[in-house]
């Protein structure tokens, strides 16, 4: 019962427990976030979307690169929105960051809008993986990159479908992505997914 409640909170943090979880995540996933950013080519003036921004730590790390980035974030959790908004208030006020609450299965952005999309420790919770990746594909520009990253153990625990690299690659290719590169270390796996048209 408690485990199910905590899993539900990890998918969509809410209330006091959600606030605590969101703050823990920002600290716990800092190392993963920095590793992902280090693995990623991020051109100056890129328009970036982070799906599942949690407490906002990845967006904060991206801003610290000082590359004049235009960053958007969407997260299903209102609690995550409030936490990230507090952390990123100055950047929100100067319009370099725009955050919203929403679902990856129905992204409120125009077609071909983003140069780079991050999904860190989040795709493992999506209800409809195919629909979610189709939506991401739609909002990506014709020469853009999707970065998917997660703890290996969480993939094994949460994903019954598309849990292996080959299954995920087949799904992404069927949607139209042209190249998938996998990188990993002892804890994490990262996919660099290219859209080229």
What do these predicted ranges mean?
Residues 49-106:
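Class I SAM-dependent methyltransferase SAM/SAH-binding core
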Residues 27-44:
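Conserved alpha-helix/loop element of class I SAM-dependent methyltransferases that forms part
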Residues 115-128:
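A short SAM/SAH-binding and catalytic strip from SAM-dependent methyltransferases
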Residues 130-142:
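A short glycine-rich, Lys/Arg-flanked "PGG" loop and its adjoining helix->strand segment in the class I
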Residues 176, 184-197:
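Core SAM-dependent methyltransferase catalytic element
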Residues 105-117:
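A short acidic, Gly/Pro-enriched loop at the edge of an enzyme's catalytic core
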